[in-house]
Design a protein with these regions (language model features):
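Short, flexible loop/hinge motifs at secondary-structure junctions
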Residues: 1-168, 238, 244, 288
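Catalytic center-proximal scaffold of phosphoryl-transfer enzymes
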Residues: 11, 39, 86-87, 103, ...
Length: 481
């Protein structure tokens, strides 16, 4: 429409002018919504492990590669001045065999050494060889005889004594199978091959499944004890990830302390599942990401993960105009925060940590309050700023509370093995399968945190289960004890 036509309508036809103005207003509003939708889709399209919670395995093909570390200028291998490391010789009391070797002839003149000359020999050069002996399972047959009573003619058969497994496999073999499955993530068929080739044990796929389920059943009490320890802990790292049961979507929750780990498979990521895991009266501090299911927790009893916040700020720094400046400023503050935390971990000076954190708090508060204003055009970083202000105390719990870190890396590392297990095994196939993997994963990660042997622990559990003794727990006071 030309200007003259518009002026003619305005001068001559008031109703038409009003209708056109209303239509223009509708189009402006529609355009605003479309621009917001385009911005949202572009932001979603640009998501990667650099700027969101996506794992690196889900990065899109167009995602920029991770920045490479600059070359150090050093050659490969040992560096000049580096103290070399060699395999240490075992002491004599730990050797199974000592074989003496003597030279027969002089390498210079071919003199044949006599026995009396061996007495003048110097300290020998020692070379130790570590070898696996031929390994084979032992098979014991228990014969239960039946006798007829000469008095009443009743027949009585002997019973298996306590400590003899009712199944066809002993506790050490069962513990080995369970360890291969949960810790080493070996498939059923590969487990059959390993047991046959290494130990001469012939098993079937059904036997493997039965052994793993039996191990899960035996871990019922230790798993319940772990749950009690988590709910009474002073600080807990918690996270969740996807799971599959019979092809249906489920959620694997993980709660970890410094020395324990507990996993639970639930229907979803809802707040009720977080409460079911931590308990209704949990009084400790929870470190997590900003997932809404944790919002029922008081901000002063939480610690938000700064690694997640760094990725959020990275996403905003890749936006436009004010959003980009907001993201860059947030990343700069985050970098200084991690530097202060690294210094604290090296020197343990909390007073100095608080002195370094104080100006960062002031800068971030100003940044967030400016971004949270209604005049901020980009709603994404306005909403993000409002969310951080709402949970403000949860940003700084690590700075004044022992045993709390600024990131949730502890929980994410604990879940990593479970995620790999899910991808290799395709999850679970039944509710009992869920229960079994919950308990085995909990025992596996807890043993790793406590620097214990999972195989040795499962052996003790299965042995106690066979004998009817109390099941050993996973409570340990310190590493190596």
């Amino acid at each position: 429409m030309e200007r003259a036509e518009a002026e003619a309508i305005l001068d001559g036809d008031r109703e038409t002018a009003v209708a056109l103005l209303l239509r223009v207003g509708e189009l402006i509003e529609a355009n605003r919504r479309l621009e917001a939708r385009v911005a949202e889709l572009e932001q979603r399209l640009n998501r990667s492990s650099r700027n969101s919670s996506l794992p690196p395995s889900q990065d899109p093909p167009a995602a920029p590669p991770r920045p490479k570390q600059p070359p150090s200028g050093r050659k490969r291998g040992g560096q000049a001045g580096h103290e070399g490391r060699h395999r240490r010789l075992l002491p004599l009391e730990r050797l199974d065999e000592v074989v003496e070797h003597w030279p027969e002839r002089c390498r210079s003149c071919a003199h044949v050494f006599e026995e009396r000359e061996l007495l003048d020999a110097a300290e020998p050069w020692r070379h130790q060889v570590t070898e696996l002996p031929p390994i084979a399972v032992t098979v014991s047959e228990h014969r239960l005889h039946r006798l007829r009573c000469p008095v009443c003619a009743a027949e009585t058969r002997a019973e298996l004594p306590a400590g003899v497994p009712r199944s066809a496999f002993g506790p050490r073999l069962q513990a080995a199978v369970a360890t291969l499955a949960v810790r080493n993530r070996v498939s059923r068929r590969d487990t059959l091959e390993l047991m046959r080739d290494l130990f001469g044990a012939e098993l079937a796929t059904g036997s493997i499944d039965a052994i793993i389920e039996r191990a899960g059943d035996a871990l019922a009490d230790p798993h319940a004890t772990l749950l009690e320890q988590i709910r009474s802990a002073a600080a807990v790292n918690i996270d969740e990830t996807g799971w599959r049961t019979a092809g249906q979507r489920r959620t694997l929750w993980g709660a970890l302390t410094e020395r324990t780990a507990l996993f639970r498979i639930a229907p979803d990521r809802h707040e009720r599942e977080a409460k079911a895991l931590l308990g209704d009266d949990f009084a400790g501090i929870t470190c997590s990401d900003r997932w809404w299911a944790y919002n029922y927790l008081h901000p002063e009893r939480r610690q938000l993960c700064w690694a997640h916040l760094a990725r959020d700020f990275t996403a905003h720094s890749e936006g436009l105009a004010a959003q980009k400046e907001f993201g860059k400023a947030g990343l700069e503050i985050t970098g200084r925060l991690f530097a202060a935390w690294d210094a604290y971990r090296n020197n343990g000076d909390r007073t100095h940590l608080l002195e370094q954190i104080a100006p960062l708090q002031a800068e971030l508060r100003t940044l967030l309050e400016q971004a949270a204003r209604k005049s901020t055009k980009t709603k994404y970083h306005r909403q993000f700023a409002n969310n951080l202000l709402k949970h403000w105390p949860a940003l700084w719990t690590f700075s004044h509370t022992d045993g709390v870190e600024p990131t949730n890396n502890h929980a994410e590392r604990g879940l990593r093995g479970a995620v790999i297990h899910r991808k290799l095994s395709l999850g679970s196939q039944s509710q009992r399968g869920e229960q079994t993997i919950e308990r085995l994963l909990s025992a596996s990660i807890t043993c790793r945190l406590q620097q214990r042997s999972l195989f040795a622990y499962l052996t003790s559990v299965l042995t106690a289960n066979i004998r009817g003794d109390p099941i050993p727990t996973l409570t340990r006071s310190s590493p190596g004890t």
